[in-house]
Amino acid sequence: AENNLKLPKLAEKDKCFQSQFNQETCMTRITTGLQEFQIHLKYLEANYEGNKNNAHSVYISTKHLLQKLRPMNQVEVTTPNPTTDSSLQALFKSQDKWLKHVTIHLILRSLEDFLQFSLRAIRIM
């Protein structure tokens, strides 16, 4: 199975790493990334077979974090493209049970990495 989810991640060009840190660019990327994750977290919430409260909590907590960071942004962050959302939803609907488990794992792993790098960047600020 190929990972074509296009999950958000921080890269050198986002200027969130200590070597080329730029607060404005970094905050914009963190906020945009969290916003992009909302689509994937909706999928997680709908398809997670474990404790539904945990899946909902991850979605809500990430949404609250996004709402806290948005006012700190000097640049207006654009919302993800609706066609991206609908094409991802179509991809998700066509998955079998095993692929759903793998997708959930990839989403959570990517979110964890993204949040760790974001926290490091925020500490630099």
Curated annotation (Swiss-Prot):
Stated role: Cytokine with a wide variety of biological functions in immunity, tissue regeneration, and metabolism. Binds to IL6R, then the complex associates to the signaling subunit IL6ST/gp130 to trigger the intracellular IL6-signaling pathway. The interaction with the membrane-bound IL6R and IL6ST stimulates 'classic signaling', whereas the binding of IL6 and soluble IL6R to IL6ST stimulates 'trans-signaling'. Alternatively, 'cluster signaling' occurs when membrane-bound IL6:IL6R complexes on transmitter cells activate IL6ST receptors on neighboring receiver cells.
Keyword Disulfide bond annotated: yes
Q: This protein is called what?
A: Interleukin-6
Q: What's the source species for this entry?
A: Neovison vison (American mink)
Q: Which SMART domains does the record cross-reference, listed alphabetically? A: IL6
> What are the entry keywords?
Acute phase, Cytokine, Disulfide bond, Growth factor, Secreted
Pfam families (alphabetical): IL6
PROSITE patterns noted in UniProt: INTERLEUKIN_6
Q: Name one GO molecular function term.
A: growth factor activity
Q: Which family does it belong to?
A: Belongs to the IL-6 superfamily.
UniProt main location, coarse: secreted
Q: Where in the cell is it found?
A: Secreted
